[in-house]
C-alpha cells in the first residue's frame, strides 16, 4: 500500500481516539475551554451519562462570528502563536484539536456571543462532514456547546461505553477535581434534568471550607493540615491529611500551575514525608504547585495528565521539605524513645507504659503472669533464631517494634557527663527479694507452666555478664590482644532479643532487660563526641531550608560562628529569613526548621560543652537504627564505666523468686 496523506475527516477521528475516550473526556475539554475564556460560571447538563447529550454553558469572552467556523477546524487555537508560547503554557488547552475531534464523532452545536456583538451566532457540524453552517441565535455573552449522540458514527467505540451511572460518575469525579482548584468559579451539574452538584464561588475562608467539605468530605476538611510554602520561585499550598486522621479516602489531587496531573514524583515525596508517621495507606492531599512555566513541560501526554519538570529532584525535595515542615508539629507514631541518661530508672517504666505490647506492666515495670509468659516465649524463640541466623537476617530483624516517644522531663539541655555516675555492684539477692516481694503483693495467680518453660529457655542464653569484674577483665585482655596482633577482638555471643526492643541478659542469678535504644543512643553520642573537637563534616542541602528569623538571630550567628562551624552548620540571614545551607550528616534527615531555631535559643546565652552538644545531636539526629549485631559489637567495645551506666538502665526480673513462689504453692 503506497504512502498517502490521510483525509481530514479520518485524521480527526484518529485524533478523537486520543482526546475523546468517554463522555467525561468531552466534559473536560469543553469546560477547560470555558475556563480559558475567562468564565466565572459554568453550567453542565448531562443526559444518559453523556451519551445522549452534553451541554456546557459559560459566561466567558465568547467567540466572534468570523472565527466560529475556524474554531471547529483542526489545529485552530487562540492560545499559542509561537514556539516560545508552547514552552511557557499557562492555559489548559493549546493544541486546537478538541472541538474538531469531538465534532468528528458527534453532532456538535456551538453558540457564542462576544461583548462587542449585537447578536449571537450558532455553528453546527457533525460526523465526518467538515462543512460548518452558521445562523443567528439568541444567547447572552459567553458560549454554549451541545454535543449530541456521542459516537453515533463509530459503533465500536459506543459499545465500549459503560452504564449511564458509571459514565456520569466519571464526569462527577472530574468536576470535583477542577472545582477544588478553581474556587473562584461557580459550577453546577445536572443529570437527566436533576441538579446533582452545585459549587458556589468561594471568596472567603468559610466558603472555601464549605467547598472543601463538599468535595473531600467533612472529616478531611476539619482535620486537614493547611500548607503554604514558598522558596526560590516555587510555591506549594493546599491541604494534607492529618496523621491523627485514620479515615481512608481517595482524595489525591495534585496541580501544577492549576492543571491536574498524576505524577509519581509527587506520590513518592508524600509517602516519604509520612514515612516517619508509619502511614500504611496512601495519605490524602490536595496540593497546588506553582512555578515558572518554562521549568515544566506539559506537552508530554495526549490527555495532558502528565508533566515533566526540568529540575525534578529539586521539585521533589521542595515538596518533601514543605510536607515535613507541616507535619513537624505532630509527633511521629511509634517513634523510638529518646533516652536521657540523667533520668532515673523510671524512664524504662514510662517506656513500658507507652507500649503495653512489650509485656511489662505500666505501673511496676514488671510482667503480669499471663502476658509475660507470651513475651518470654517470644524471647526464647528470638534467642534460638539469633543464634542460628546469619548477619543479614539479624539486620533484617532489627527494630521489629518501636517505643512511643517519651518527652524529656528537663527543660534545658544538660551535659551528659559519665563522671557523675558511680558504678554499682549488683546485689542479686536484695534486688530479687525486694522485687519479688512487690510482685507477690500485687498478684495472686500462680506462674503458668508455659512461663516456667520460657524462663528455662531464657536461662539457656549464653551468660554475658556472669561477673562484672571478670567480664571486663576478659574484654580488656581482648583489647590488649587486638592491639598487639592487629586482629579483631572476639565478641561474646549476642543474647536473646525480647520484642525487638530489649536484650535479655543473665548476670549471676539476675535476668535483666537492657533497652536496645538506650545502647544505640549511647553509641551514637560517643561517636559524635569523638568527632566534635575537630569539627563535624558539613553536607550541603540540595534545597536550602528557609525559616522566619527573629531580630536577634543575626547577632547569635556572629557570636557563635566558630561553634556553628564546629557543628557543621552554615547559616545565613537573608530578607528576614534564616537560610540553612549546610548541616552535619546526623541532622540531614531531621526537622531542620524546628531544630535549628531551638539550637540558636540554646546557645544564645551559653556555650554548651562537648558532651551536651553530642547528646543533643544524638537525640535529634538520624532516625535509622543500627542492626542488632552492629549494636552488640559496639556495646562489647565500650569501657567498663559506660557498660555499667547502661546496665543500670536494665530492668531486673526476679525469675528466681517467681520460681520459688511457684514451687512453694
Swiss-Prot record:
Pfam families hit by this protein: DNA_mis_repair (PF01119), HATPase_c_3 (PF13589), MutL_C (PF08676)
GO BP: any one term: mismatch repair
Stretches for region Disordered: 348-370, 385-445
Xref: Gene3D superfamilies: 3.30.230.10, Histidine kinase-like ATPase, C-terminal domain, MutL, C-terminal domain, dimerisation subdomain, MutL, C-terminal domain, regulatory subdomain
SUPFAM superfamilies found in the cross-reference section: ATPase domain of HSP90 chaperone/DNA topoisomerase II/histidine kinase, DNA mismatch repair protein MutL, Ribosomal protein S5 domain 2-like
CC annotations in GO: mismatch repair complex
Biased composition (Polar residues): 348-361, 407-421
Record keywords, A-Z: DNA damage, DNA repair
Source taxon at top rank: Bacteria
Biased composition range(s): Low complexity: 426-445
UniProt function note: This protein is involved in the repair of mismatches in DNA. It is required for dam-dependent methyl-directed DNA mismatch repair. May act as a 'molecular matchmaker', a protein that promotes the formation of a stable complex between two or more DNA-binding proteins in an ATP-dependent manner without itself being part of a final effector complex.
Family: Belongs to the DNA mismatch repair MutL/HexB family.
Official protein name in the record: DNA mismatch repair protein MutL
Organism annotation: Shewanella denitrificans (strain OS217 / ATCC BAA-1090 / DSM 15013)
Primary gene name: mutL
